């Protein structure tokens, strides 16, 4: 693993007890979460992907979550999410897909997802049979693409994602059309006032998942705009963010056993 110099010093530790939650989700209060800059090679065999890895410390192997960020805002808000997942007892990889720009073609997205998944599977402290993906905004589209391409993913969580690509986006597979390829528990967390991904579209996605008999849950937050869960996004809403991460933690604890830590590791 080659360390990169980008915003965070490699190996720096963060104490995150303030975000440990209310006991309804997995986690340990006041633990040190190490975040380091890493790089790995895309599935195309040539492109380097600068990313961040959060490690919960203690004894592994751990379940792991691949974080697929949105377009807007700096990495900082997503690094905080990786730290939070580390605090819950997961290894978390913040995938640096924006090295491709803000709207890469699907072929590059799939290549880079392959590189990220290969990196996670080969990480010595990760249990390769316990992998999940969190997608935010545009990364929510990528999360559904990952679920179709990687059958070893056990859980998918999408925060303020899309049922259909924005009109200004590059043409590609529609999330709505990826529904049939989702065979694992899916949680969608969405605002009723999402100006980029209308509520009606997401309700249509919900109905399709139900018609297909998919193990999907949809949670809607009244009056909340796009980007509500990410602190550095213009649409951030603290109450909805807290509620959505409580839901995500509950969902992981239910569908990805072994995330909670016990005994001397608490």
Q: Language-model segments: what does each one mean?
A:
Residues 125-136:
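Alpha/beta-hydrolase fold nucleophile elbow
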Residues 152-163:
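A conserved short beta-strand
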Residues 182, 188-190, 194:
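Short beta-strand/loop motif that positions the catalytic acidic residue
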Residues 196-201:
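Conserved alpha/beta-hydrolase "acid-adjacent" motif
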């Amino acid at each position: 693993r080659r360390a990169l110099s980008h915003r965070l010093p490699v190996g720096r530790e963060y104490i995150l007890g303030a975000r440990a939650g209310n006991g309804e989700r997995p986690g340990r209060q006041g633990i040190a979460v190490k975040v380091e800059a890493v790089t790995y090679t895309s599935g195309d065999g040539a492109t380097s992907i600068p990313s961040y890895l959060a490690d919960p410390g203690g004894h592994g192997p751990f379940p792991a979550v691949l974080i697929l960020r949105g377009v807007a805002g700096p990495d900082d808000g997503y690094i905080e999410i990786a730290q939070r997942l580390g605090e819950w007892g997961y290894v978390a990889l913040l995938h640096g897909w924006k090295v491709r720009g803000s709207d890469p073609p699907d072929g590059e997205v799939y290549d880079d997802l392959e590189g990220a998944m290969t990196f996670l599977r080969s990480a010595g402290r990760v249990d390769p049979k316990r992998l999940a993906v969190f997608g935010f905004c545009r990364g929510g589209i990528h999360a559904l693409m990952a679920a179709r391409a990687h059958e070893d993913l056990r859980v998918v969580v999408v925060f303020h994602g899309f049922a259909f690509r924005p009109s200004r986006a590059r043409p590609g597979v529609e999330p709505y059309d990826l529904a049939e390829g989702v065979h694992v528990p899916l949680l969608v967390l969405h605002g009723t006032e999402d100006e980029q991904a209308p509520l009606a579209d997401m309700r249509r996605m919900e109905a399709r998942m139900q018609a297909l008999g998919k193990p999907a849950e949809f949670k809607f937050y009244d009056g909340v705009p796009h980007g509500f869960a990410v602190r550095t996004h213009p649409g951030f809403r603290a109450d909805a963010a807290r509620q959505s991460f409580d839901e995500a933690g509950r969902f992981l604890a239910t569908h990805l056993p072994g995330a909670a830590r016990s005994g001397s590791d608490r």
